Design a protein with these regions (language model features):
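N-terminal and secondary-structure boundary signal
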Residues: 1-301
């Protein structure tokens, strides 16, 4: 998608119909989102604390899947992948909460070994007992599920670990995307399916992402906006901004909607309703889209 095409689609998105979404809240039922500024480790810890602690989501002896973006063989300064210290901090917190095992998983787009090495995520997690970082590139690791609420998708093959009842925490990075304008939490769900190419070639990708979000529902989304790839996404190189933010919430649409507001994309500011897959997800009742109607806790780490 060219910059011009994204701008055109974004402008059209504001004219689409609107449907209210469900309510979500965080610690003490006061906030929809926690937005914490600071360095990766401190801000991530503060965000987990602000949402009531990781123990709200991870119980003793549970197995956990962390889904960062590590699809590209890029170092963290490219902002094409989730910051390794953000991932490691969350993984450590899960184990401290009593998790039996933490699997850090992604279906990488590029060569698995290079992705694991260059993103720094495997290195950051290697000394945390019970944490395993894996790139799943074989079909045997995926299982098929039906999508009852799908408009263009009837079924999809997803990580088997999701089907096995693991706690799922989505840890996307904030970046632009050539096909969808931005890539945040909902777009990042595509890293958990086998056949991503069909989203690009067979379906309206924005509708397909929203369909996918009806069956893959992370218990928690933590957006890494310590850096943001404001152009040239998803793989870069491009313009890298440094908001130094961590955004955490239960509502994936709300997290992404705030993410849209963090930096200008392609040199222009956008509203969440101008991002088609977010608007469609909101219309499906998957979350709140208007950030001026969200209760947001903002703090510094």
């Amino acid at each position: 998608m060219t910059r011009r095409k994204f701008l055109k689609i974004a402008a059209a998105g504001t004219a689409l119909g609107l449907v209210g979404g469900p309510s979500f809240s965080l610690a003490k039922e006061e906030y929809d989102l926690a937005v914490i500024s600071g360095q990766p480790v401190a801000a991530t810890r503060k965000a987990l604390e602000a949402i009531g602690g990781i123990s709200r989501f991870v119980k003793n002896a549970q197995r956990v899947v962390l889904k960062p973006n590590m699809s590209f063989a890029r170092t963290p300064d490219f902002s094409a992948t989730t910051h390794p210290l953000v991932v490691a901090t969350i993984a450590q917190a899960c184990m401290e909460a009593g998790a039996q095992q933490v699997l850090v998983l992604d279906h990488t787009l590029q060569r698995a070994e290079l992705c694991l090495e260059r993103t720094g995520i495997r290195e950051a997690c290697k000394n945390i007992p019970g944490v395993h970082v894996l790139a799943l590139q074989e079909r045997k690791f995926f299982g098929e599920i039906k999508i009852p609420q799908g408009k263009v998708l009837e079924r999809v093959e997803v990580f088997k670990e999701i089907l096995d009842g693991h706690v799922l925490i989505n840890i996307p990075v904030a970046k632009s995307h050539s096909a969808t304008g931005v890539s945040l939490g909902l777009k990042g769900l595509m890293g958990m399916i086998w056949d991503r190419e069909s989203f690009h070639s067979q379906y309206n990708i924005n509708q397909a992402i929203a369909d996918l979000a009806t069956v893959i529902k992370p218990q928690l989304t933590i957006l890494d906006a310590t850096r943001a790839l404001a152009s040239g996404g998803p793989g870069g190189p491009g313009e890298v901004k440094k908001p130094n933010l961590i955004v955490a919430g239960i509502d994936p649409v709300a997290v992404d909607s705030y993410g849209v507001s963090i930096v200008p994309w392609y040199g222009q500011n956008f509203r969440s309703r101008q991002v088609e897959h977010l608007l469609v997800a909101h219309q499906k009742g998957l979350g709140k889209i208007d950030i001026d109607q969200l209760k947001i806790l903002k703090e510094k780490a």
